[in-house]
Amino acid sequence: QYPALKIDLMLEERVLDLPMREADVAIRLKEPSQADLIRKKLMGVNMRLYATHAYLDAHGRPERMEDLSKHRIICQNTNSAQVSAGATFTQEILTHNVDSLLTVNNYFGVLQAVLNGLGIGILPDYILQDFPEIERVLPEEESREIPVFLAYPEELRHSKRIAAFRDFVTEEIFEHRKQALESGNV
């Protein structure tokens, strides 16, 4: 729809300084604190436990939190820049005598490890719809809701390229959530 739009996607664990133009737009898993940013809540996510069907068939399906001690947990390091609700959930999982642990520095890495059958991963709820080979583990366990915000500097309020990107992201999230509701993957 916008062939001349150039996007430089940076998957960073640090908070970029938007007013200093480290980036034009950011999608953050918490409300931005800088006063001179325009912010729009896109959605809320929950962190949950996931594994492939093949992994669970081979290693068993945990029925309670204590059963996690028999599995490798794949997660982000709790000292990383992740949001508190996700870190709190991860710390809670790790209190169950987890012997085998694989930490990765971003959720894409956690997802890749899960898809390759390395264990049970802590991931955002929206991934289930796109990966039919994974299933939710311990469905009653999840983090508190984590708000996801789109943010950009006030000075870019009237930028057509920012508006195009904002509208595209908003529409894609709406469609993804709609499909998730229709398929029951919420």
List where the protein language model places each region:
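Residue-level signal for short, function-critical loop segments
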Residues: 13, 53, 154-156
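Short amphipathic alpha-helical coupling segments at ligand-binding clamshell hinges
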Residues: 157-171
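A bilobed periplasmic-binding-protein/Venus flytrap-type ligand-binding module shared by bacterial periplasmic
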Residues: 148-158
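Central regulatory/effector-binding core of bacterial HTH transcription factors
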Residues: 1-35, 186
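C-terminal regulatory
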Residues: 20, 32-148, 175-186
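Generic non-transmembrane alpha-helical segments
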Residues: 1, 168-176
